[in-house]
Amino acid sequence: MVKEFNSLEEIQKYYDKESNTYVFRENDRYIDLVKFNFDLNVNANIDARDIIAWSINTHDIYAYDIKVDDIIANDIYANNINAIVIKAYDISYYALCFAYCSIKCKSITGRRKDAKHFVFDGKLEVEQDE
């Protein structure tokens, strides 16, 4: 099920006061894909199975840590990244970027002097422009 929202007011019915988060469920089923057609700025933790976006940065999603199964994006800008699979065009991180299975990108850069990026199982692929 896909659900699109055009304003913050439209998502209010999904707010769960007890957990202080939004739970996107209808008819006892989670909504598979939630699409926001407006700027969304939140001061919260983002726990997700997949984040699919054109860009993840301080203008779109600001987080000290991004922890998800898959990140698929053109550009990622974050402090730390912890994921199963990362597929991106450019990755810029502060101190640490790692994936359990793979990282595939055009560029990957740590902004701290001794920043590290690595993959536990699988490989890191930095594709060169042809």
What are these regions (language model features)?
Residues N43-A95:
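A detector of tandem-repeat and repeat-rich interaction/domain scaffolds
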Residues M1-D47, N82-E130:
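Intrinsically disordered, low-complexity terminal regions
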